[in-house]
Structure formats: C-alpha cells, structure tokens
C-alpha cells in the first residue's frame, strides 16, 4: 500500500513543478499509454522500490526505501545546456532533506539527488537521468 502512496507523492511533487515551468513540461509516468510527440521535451518518472524493512520486528512499523528515477528528455543534437539546467532544477526540487507528505506518510529525501551522464536514448532524445533516494516509515 505504501509504495502506491510514495509513488503518488513523488509524482505529484514533480508534476506540480513541471506544470509551473514556461512552457510547461509534460511528465510521462509508468505504465501509461500516453507517449511524447516527436521532439517533445518531457520528463519521465519511475519508482524503484528496495526491500521493505521491519525495524520494530512486530510488523507495526514498516520502512520503505528506494529510488525515484527522473529522466529529462530533450531532442537530440540541440546541445547539453538545457538538459543540464533542468537536471539541476530537479536536483534542487528534491534536495535533502525534503519531506513530502501524502495520506499520512512522510516521504523523506535521504541525500542530494545524483545527476548521471546524459546519453542518447535511441528514440531521438537526449536523456539525462536523475536518481533521488527516498525513505518512508509506515506505522499503520
């Protein structure tokens, strides 16, 4: 249940920011039929949960942690400057120690997001991945 809440919290945080950009940046989410138009600048978010922990040994406390991977996709052959700027802005958006609350769950950003090497994605886009580590405790 909490992975669903965590995904919703992180996606909502990203989508709110992306909608406020000029022009707005579309965000494409996992397992959805919507796809970007040819050459359309966009973001993609993927939740990568790790093993759930039971710190209390009584099953009343579960700790969810993992990574939220955000990809910045810009048309190929337009340079790296815009991709670098967007990646840096997302790094700031999810800076440590950001806390995003959804349905009583506090999703904590555990460290500064990592911006990896950009590369072509094979579909006409230049992709810059940003890895955001999170943790959330569920006491329900």
Residue ranges and their predicted role:
Residues 1-60, 78-81, 92-93, 97-108:
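Small/polar-rich, solvent-exposed N-terminal microdomains that initiate assembly or binding
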Residues 3, 83, 121-125:
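Short capping loops/turns at secondary-structure boundaries
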Residues 21-22, 91-137:
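Acidic-leaning, charged glycine-interspersed low-complexity segments
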Residues 50-52, 65-69, 90-96, 132-133:
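Short, surface-exposed linear patches
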Residues 56-63, 120-123:
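Short, solvent-exposed beta-strand/turn "edge" segments of beta-rich domains on protein surfaces
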Residues 61-77, 126-137:
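Oligomerization/assembly interface segments of phage tail-like spikes and tubes
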Residues 84, 88-89:
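Terminal beta-strand-rich extracellular "head" domains
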């Amino acid at each position: 249940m909490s992975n669903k809440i965590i995904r919703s919290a992180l996606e909502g945080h990203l989508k709110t920011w992306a909608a406020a950009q000029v022009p707005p940046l579309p965000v494409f989410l996992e397992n959805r039929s919507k796809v970007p138009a040819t050459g359309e600048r966009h973001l993609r978010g993927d939740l990568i949960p790790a093993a759930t922990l039971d710190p209390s040994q009584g099953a009343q406390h579960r700790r969810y942690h993992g990574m939220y991977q955000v990809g910045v996709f810009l048309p190929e052959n337009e340079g790296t400057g815009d991709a670098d700027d967007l990646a840096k802005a997302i790094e700031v958006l999810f800076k440590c120690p950001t806390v995003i609350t959804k349905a009583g769950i506090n999703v904590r950003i555990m460290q500064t997001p990592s911006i990896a090497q950009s590369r072509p994605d094979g579909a006409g886009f230049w992709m810059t991945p940003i890895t955001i580590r999170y943790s959330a405790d569920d006491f329900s």
